[in-house]
Amino acid sequence: MIPRNFFFTILICAFNVCATFTAVATASPDCIGPFASYALFAFVTCICVCSIVCLVINFFQLVDWIFVRIAYLRHHPEYRNQNVAALLRLI
């Protein structure tokens, strides 16, 4: 089974992006000054970039987990260690 932390990380990134876009959608540019609008734009950009980086790292971890699982399952059964498999959540 795929570890739950992959799903939690994806959900946290999606929640951050959605919450940020919701906050920006309700902000009126006529009511805030130029510095505040630039600060808001920088905040939104930072959250989006951090979420994308987090998703890329999560994707690489998932690919690594799949390759480790394939390499483990290709070994002969007598060389498989159940403790290692349980530790890596491979089975």
From Swiss-Prot:
Which keywords does this Swiss-Prot/TrEMBL entry list?
Early protein, Host endoplasmic reticulum, Host membrane, Membrane, Signal, Transmembrane, Transmembrane helix
Provide the coiled-coil residue spans. Answer: none
- Classify the protein's membrane topology as the record does: Single-pass type I membrane protein
Work out whether the entry's keyword set contains Lyase. no
Compartments where located: Host endoplasmic reticulum membrane
Q: Which GO terms describe its cellular component?
A: host cell endoplasmic reticulum membrane; membrane
Signal peptide limits: 1-22
Q: List the disulfide bonds.
A: none
Residue ranges crossing the lipid bilayer per the database entry: 35-60
Protein origin, superkingdom: Viruses
Positions in the Cytoplasmic compartment? 61-91
UniProt KW Secreted keyword: no
- Per the UniProt topology annotation, the Lumenal ranges are 23-34
What function does this protein fulfil?
Down-regulates the EGF receptor.
Family, according to the entry, reads as follows: Belongs to the adenoviridae E3B family.
The name of this protein is Early E3B 10.4 kDa protein
